Amino acid sequence: MFHLDTLATLVAATLTLLLGRKLVHSVSFLKKYTIPEPVAGGLLVALALLVLKKSMGWEVNFDMSLRDPLMLAFFATIGLNANIASLRAGGRVVGIFLIVVVGLLVMQNAIGIGMASLLGLDPLMGLLAGSITLSGGHGTGAAWSKLFIERYGFTNATEVAMACATFGLVLGGLIGGPVARYLVKHSTTPNGIPDDQEVPTAFEKPDVGRMITSLVLIETIALIAICLTVGKIVAQLLAGTAFELPTFVCVLFVGVILSNGLSIMGFYRVFERAVSVLGNVSLSLFLAMALMGLKLWELASLALPMLAILVVQTIFMALYAIFVTWRMMGKNYDAAVLAAGHCGFGLGATPTAIANMQAITERFGPSHMAFLVVPMVGAFFIDIVNALVIKLYLMLPIFAG
């Protein structure tokens, strides 16, 4: 086994991103279907490591100590760039999107349990291949698998959960681009151009140019560091209470409170462009690390019936995004970008959703509403409603005892 330390892993992640960029610009298929650069590069590296593992018996182990801080830094930038006025304006849209998301959670579990029963598997495996890991991700999967082991005696719950979450992360990044590209073509907005081309003015005067200087970067890094520090403290204080929240949600909300508080007091205005640059860097590096570190041989160990459930879930996610998400959200360009985001966190995670949306907006134009709604629902509300839906399913007679 080869072990790469923190710095070597960072080098590998940056090279993976550059490789992904080269691939997307060189391979017409990837460019045509708007595959995110971290997904393209990360998957190629993961496949290369799989070949090394199977042919030579070599395994490369990465030091992922930077991965979680990078993810938290990304969510901090989402919070710092959110202003209260925009949140109020997006209230109705957030409500509609949340209803759409709840519908998917219910259907994912119904499909998982139905397919598991049809294939003669434990219904708990169907739940693990449902909203627990697909909409919930690795963290939610790990948390629920512990409960399944202790309460239901499902000894392989953790392995199944991690494999399903990994599969979902990969597919979530792959189907978002093609789905959105199809929807943009059929959008009610002429030529796929977004209705909202206005420059966001939450913290910036669009007519006044500002440089991203070293001082601005230091100020922005300080704000992000404060969000991470305070967010972790808040998460620890809430742990074990009825108000317990994942750390990244606490970090996001600290960012919202910090930026709006400073703005209201007139003490400091967050430089949106600098925050966005650092957020994009954090997200790209996080995704590169997450994907290049995938142990694809763990997917190969999944039984064919489990793979069958996951394939059905993936097809259903794409159809749901096209026929439900896009239509419910208005059948316009914003709705198409939202659908791409829904594919991302409906099968994988919120960072995958953001990467999907970035890949679309870089090509077709901005969608301020999508970048406001998806992080709010995907990073906060999804954990709450998913837990409620899962608990309701566990009350069914098939899970008694």
UniProtKB/Swiss-Prot annotation:
<keyword id="KW-0472">Membrane</keyword>
<feature type="topological domain" description="Periplasmic">
    <location>
        <begin position="117"/>
        <end position="156"/>
    </location>
</feature>
<feature type="transmembrane region" description="Helical">
    <location>
        <begin position="213"/>
        <end position="235"/>
    </location>
</feature>
<keyword id="KW-0813">Transport</keyword>
<feature type="topological domain" description="Periplasmic">
    <location>
        <begin position="293"/>
        <end position="301"/>
    </location>
</feature>
<feature type="transmembrane region" description="Helical">
    <location>
        <begin position="277"/>
        <end position="292"/>
    </location>
</feature>
<keyword id="KW-1003">Cell membrane</keyword>
<feature type="transmembrane region" description="Helical">
    <location>
        <begin position="302"/>
        <end position="324"/>
    </location>
</feature>
<feature type="topological domain" description="Cytoplasmic">
    <location>
        <begin position="268"/>
        <end position="276"/>
    </location>
</feature>
<keyword id="KW-0029">Amino-acid transport</keyword>
<keyword id="KW-0406">Ion transport</keyword>
<feature type="topological domain" description="Cytoplasmic">
    <location>
        <begin position="25"/>
        <end position="32"/>
    </location>
</feature>
<keyword id="KW-1133">Transmembrane helix</keyword>
<protein>
    <recommendedName>
        <fullName>Sodium/glutamate symporter</fullName>
    </recommendedName>
</protein>
<feature type="topological domain" description="Cytoplasmic">
    <location>
        <begin position="325"/>
        <end position="367"/>
    </location>
</feature>
<keyword id="KW-0915">Sodium</keyword>
<feature type="topological domain" description="Cytoplasmic">
    <location>
        <begin position="88"/>
        <end position="93"/>
    </location>
</feature>
<comment type="similarity">
    <text>Belongs to the glutamate:Na(+) symporter (ESS) (TC 2.A.27) family.</text>
</comment>
<dbReference type="GO" id="GO:0015813">
    <property type="term" value="P:L-glutamate transmembrane transport"/>
</dbReference>
<feature type="topological domain" description="Periplasmic">
    <location>
        <begin position="236"/>
        <end position="244"/>
    </location>
</feature>
<dbReference type="GO" id="GO:0005886">
    <property type="term" value="C:plasma membrane"/>
</dbReference>
<feature type="transmembrane region" description="Helical">
    <location>
        <begin position="94"/>
        <end position="116"/>
    </location>
</feature>
<keyword id="KW-0769">Symport</keyword>
<feature type="topological domain" description="Periplasmic">
    <location>
        <begin position="53"/>
        <end position="69"/>
    </location>
</feature>
<feature type="transmembrane region" description="Helical">
    <location>
        <begin position="33"/>
        <end position="52"/>
    </location>
</feature>
<comment type="function">
    <text>Catalyzes the sodium-dependent, binding-protein-independent transport of glutamate.</text>
</comment>
<keyword id="KW-0812">Transmembrane</keyword>
<dbReference type="Pfam" id="PF03616">
    <property type="entry name" value="Glt_symporter"/>
</dbReference>
<dbReference type="InterPro" id="IPR004445">
    <property type="entry name" value="GltS"/>
</dbReference>
<feature type="topological domain" description="Cytoplasmic">
    <location>
        <begin position="180"/>
        <end position="212"/>
    </location>
</feature>
<feature type="transmembrane region" description="Helical">
    <location>
        <begin position="7"/>
        <end position="24"/>
    </location>
</feature>
<keyword id="KW-0997">Cell inner membrane</keyword>
<keyword id="KW-0739">Sodium transport</keyword>
<feature type="topological domain" description="Periplasmic">
    <location>
        <begin position="391"/>
        <end position="401"/>
    </location>
</feature>
<dbReference type="GO" id="GO:0015293">
    <property type="term" value="F:symporter activity"/>
</dbReference>
<feature type="transmembrane region" description="Helical">
    <location>
        <begin position="70"/>
        <end position="87"/>
    </location>
</feature>
<feature type="transmembrane region" description="Helical">
    <location>
        <begin position="157"/>
        <end position="179"/>
    </location>
</feature>
<feature type="transmembrane region" description="Helical">
    <location>
        <begin position="368"/>
        <end position="390"/>
    </location>
</feature>
<feature type="topological domain" description="Periplasmic">
    <location>
        <begin position="1"/>
        <end position="6"/>
    </location>
</feature>
<dbReference type="GO" id="GO:0015501">
    <property type="term" value="F:glutamate:sodium symporter activity"/>
</dbReference>
<feature type="transmembrane region" description="Helical">
    <location>
        <begin position="245"/>
        <end position="267"/>
    </location>
</feature>
